Structures are given as C-alpha cells and as structure tokens.
Design a protein with these regions (language model features):
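Acidic/polar-rich alpha-helix caps and helix-coil junctions
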Residues: 1-94, 125-286
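Acidic-aromatic pocket-rim loops
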Residues: 93-112, 232
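Short, cationic low-complexity segments
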Residues: 104-127
C-alpha cells in the first residue's frame, strides 16, 4: 500500500513544471519526480516502467555528466547540469546549513571505513571526495566542503538527492534486467551507460571479459553505485533492492542481520495515534 501511494503521488507530480526561475530554484521539477518514480519502479522490479521513465529523462538532453566529478559538488557550481534535484541550504541563516560535518572532538567517530576507502582504484577521481578537510572549527568531507560561516558556524552546500549519474546507472541496471547485451558501443546495452560513469571517474571500460554474465553485470552496477554515491543516501536502498544487504554487511563487518531488520519500524508515535493493530500493526518483531 505504501508503494502504491508513492507511485500515485509521483505520477501526479509529473504535472509539475520542468523548470523554475531563479526565485523558485530548488523546487521539485517534473524531471525530478520522474526520476524518483523510475527509482520506485526499479525497487519494485517494474523494469519496463522504470526503463520508460529513465529514457524520458535521457532523451530530454537537459542533463549530462560534468567532466570533473569535483565540480558536481562545488559550492560555487550548485544546480549544475548534472543535478535533477537538490535540497538547498544557506550557511548565513541560523539553522539554514546542513550537518555533513564533524566537530574537532568527533573527527575520529565519523571516518570512512577501510572497506570503502580500499574499494577505490588508485586512479579513481572519486576517491579524493572522501577526504576530510578542516573548515573553521569543523571537518568536512571534500564532497561537501564549504568555508564555514563566521557568524552561524555553519556550512551551506546543497545536498544532492538526484543526479544524472544515478539515471545512467539505473538505466544500465534496467537494460541488464531486460537482456545481457555485451556490445559496449550500443545504446541498448547496459555496458554503454555503466562505462559513461566509469569514464568520468578516469577508469577503463568494462567489457564481457571482466563481466561475463548478467548476474556479474548486476554486481558491477551495484559496485559502481557504491563508489559513485557515498554520503548521498543511496547505499542502504541499493542493498535492499538487490537483496544483498545481509551478505554485504556480513562480509564487511562480520555482523549477522536478522531479516526483520531489513525494514524499519513504523514510528511508534504513528502506531499510538491509531492505537489499533488491526488497522496499523507495527512491523514484525519491533
């Protein structure tokens, strides 16, 4: 029922404008709604629907990968050609900044795991975005680096929710579910779109020599998403969608995750408002 409502809301949101003037910049566009709708369809294995909406975005030619990955997150280059939707912040307003930073006392608590850092090839242009840099009294990962405001002690980069690299990797995933096409130069092949993202990162093309099967390609896309989107809120949902959460967490941290933990509990305040388990039961084992 929840996903039915999400799909319905996003289909309704397709009526939104596809652009806004500067005064309304940051509002959700029809393209952003369509991208999230495609991701919802992908999650629910409605591959043909996902393919249709992802292709709609690609053929607009409004979006593209920036040449340098660092420019995507540059505070002086916000709402660039790669961005479909971003939450806007302002460091000069009280409580207007974001929390993607660590205080000096917390700097040892929020570091990236060796598992993630070790996953990057030495030539991968994305690796440097994980490094922390001091700004005023806080440390920020380079992906969200900004100069701390002297008055509010805050930073104010936009938080990117949807960008074109996500569209390309979702499209690669969908095409692979449709058929395993090994022609890396064909726009009907998932390799074509996967390699676009890899090329921007400075990495060589993958071919059927390195990725010899449909299941291997699915793993390759999941791994590319791991390297492309840290700190962007995608990883958990990618693992759940692909059914690999328990396996990946076990391999990385030797932790066994029980099945019921793969979904979150319904907020207790909402359950208590209804106060009727026949109408709104809590998720099992919570």
């Amino acid at each position: 029922k929840v996903y039915e409502q999400i799909e319905s809301d996003l289909i309704f949101a397709l009526q939104l404008p596809d652009t806004y003037d500067k005064s309304d910049l940051g509002r959700v566009t029809s393209n952003a709604a369509e991208a999230l709708l495609a991701k919802t369809y992908l999650t629910n294995k409605k591959y043909n629907d996902a393919k249709t909406h992802l292709n709609n975005i690609i053929i607009t030619e409004k979006y593209d990968l920036l040449t340098d990955i660092k420019d995507v997150f540059d505070v002086n280059n916000e709402m660039n050609k790669e961005i479909l939707f971003a939450i806007k912040y302002s460091k000069t307003l009280i409580d207007g900044g974001h929390g993607m930073w660590l205080s000096l006392s917390d700097v040892t608590l929020g570091h990236f795991s060796d598992v993630l850092k070790g996953a990057y090839n030495s030539d991968d242009a994305r690796a440097g975005l994980l490094e922390y840099k001091k700004s005023g009294s806080v440390y920020l990962p380079m992906k969200y680096y900004d100069i701390q405001d002297v008055s509010t002690k805050d930073v104010g980069n936009d938080f990117i929710v949807l960008r074109y690299a996500d569209i390309l990797l979702m499209y690669a995933e969908v095409l692979n579910e449709e058929s395993f096409d090994t022609d890396i130069n064909s726009k009907n092949s998932g390799f074509y779109y996967l390699n676009k993202v890899r090329d921007r990162a400075g990495l060589p093309n993958l071919t059927s020599l390195e990725v010899p099967s449909q299941s291997d390609f699915k793993k390759a896309v999941l791994n590319e998403r791991y390297l492309e989107f840290p700190l962007e809120g995608n990883r958990w949902f990618d693992l759940i969608r692909t059914g690999t959460a328990k396996e990946v967490i076990k391999a990385a941290y030797d932790i066994d995750i029980p099945d019921y933990r793969l979904i979150f509990p319904i907020p207790s305040a909402e359950v208590e408002k209804v106060n009727n388990p026949n109408i709104l039961p809590q998720n099992p084992q919570y």
